[in-house]
Amino acid sequence: MDDKLMLMIPGPTPVPEAALLALAKHPIGHRTSEFSNMMGEVTQNLKWLHQTESDVLMLNVSGTGAVEAGMINFLSPGDRILVGSNGKFGERWVEVGQAFGLNVEAITAEWGQPLDPDKFAQKLQADTNKEIKAVIITHSETSTGVINDLVAINSHVKEHGQALIIVDAVTSLGAYNVPVDALGLDVVASGSQKGYMIPPGLGFVSVSPKAWEAYKTAKLPKYYLDLGKYRKATAKNTTPFTPPVNLMVALHTTLGMMKKEGLESIFTRHERQKNATRAAMKALNLPLFAADECASPAITAVATPGMEADKIRSLMKKRFDIALAGGQDHLSNKIFRVGHLGFVSDRDILSCIASLEVVLLELGHENFNSGAGVAAAARVFSN
């Protein structure tokens, strides 16, 4: 029997029915007062979500495009930058920097381990000539389920005084507290298919006054991703290029849902679902790839010693129409990843865990008591 696909991956994430209905509406003109009024509300709600009074700009890109825009608008060829790399996406920002002729110094950690703030401190404190122009980190490393210590790393950047802090918040914004103004974050990039609860296609970049000062002298080439164009257009509640109108209508809907729930409730929900998922995996005797103290609220990576992770994922899809994410690069077939990001309910978590128990038993992983995973998650949810 055909079942309803359950997306339990870190993106694209499930889309609420209200947003699906918004996507199905007849398009409106993007140079009309109707669109401008809607965009004005969306922009204000984006500032609410980012906890900022500064600009939050919308681009027709994925999260990668948003991060690239967040780099190239504020830097010049040959600029020295520090890039934290402890997973697939940290590695990507190293590659982007190299592609644009930046002097990239990677500060690395093993996949599954958090970045060490002290390593950033050492580099920044030694930079007495203030040659480091930016520090770029991935807040929630989607490939491993690790949350990096943004607060600690940012504090060292602030002590440096000159470098910008540029943050990939693609799977943390909307799941974890990212108070842009309170932390003084210069550039924060994210994507629509994550905590925003709509399909891929929109990227978001918040920009501080300090970053706009750097923009004035930045010399890396840009046209479509020139944030200055977006800033001027956004001030008039319009866009520099044709936007994905219906995606923005859907975003208007989901941001309204988020405001109704409230930031603290959103963060609490993601933390609760993370804890339930991790408790279940421990009860099923499946090793967690990230330690509790650095676990992302958006995704849980699970190791599968003695089993092929892709067989688990395949059987979950075949038997229960539940999609789990796989490992990337050298972690391929060695881990699976459970997304608990955006429009995911406690019921979804319980359904996923119950289905996983069946699959594990079918694959011969029997060193757990039947129902142990569900019971462990239920205890978290009942508190």
Curated annotation (Swiss-Prot):
Function statement: Soluble hydrogenase catalyzes both production and consumption of hydrogen from suitable artificial electron donors or acceptors. This subunit catalyzes the tritium-exchange activity.
Broad class of the protein's primary localization: cytoplasm
Cellular localization per UniProt: Cytoplasm
Pfam families: Aminotran_5 (PF00266)
EC numbers, comma separated: 1.12.-.-
Needed co-factor(s): pyridoxal 5'-phosphate
EC primary class: oxidoreductase
Organism in which the protein naturally occurs: Anabaena cylindrica
Family: Belongs to the class-V pyridoxal-phosphate-dependent aminotransferase family.
Keyword RNA-binding found: no
Protein name: Soluble hydrogenase 42 kDa subunit
Modified residues (N6-(pyridoxal phosphate)lysine): 194
Cystine pairings recorded for this chain: none
Quaternary structure, from the entry: Heterodimer of a large and a small subunit.
GO annotations of cellular component type: cytoplasm
Molecular functions (GO terms): alanine-glyoxylate transaminase activity; L-serine-pyruvate transaminase activity; oxidoreductase activity
Coiled-coil ranges (or none): none
SUPFAM superfamilies with a match to the protein in the record: PLP-dependent transferases (SSF53383)
Xref: InterPro entries: Aminotrans_V_dom (IPR000192), Aminotrans_V_PyrdxlP_BS (IPR020578), PyrdxlP-dep_Trfase (IPR015424), PyrdxlP-dep_Trfase_major (IPR015421), PyrdxlP-dep_Trfase_small (IPR015422), SP_NH2Trfase/AEP_transaminase (IPR024169)
Superkingdom of origin organism: Bacteria
This protein's UniProt keywords: Cytoplasm, Oxidoreductase, Pyridoxal phosphate
Keyword Oxidoreductase: yes
GO annotation terms (biological process): glycine biosynthetic process, by transamination of glyoxylate
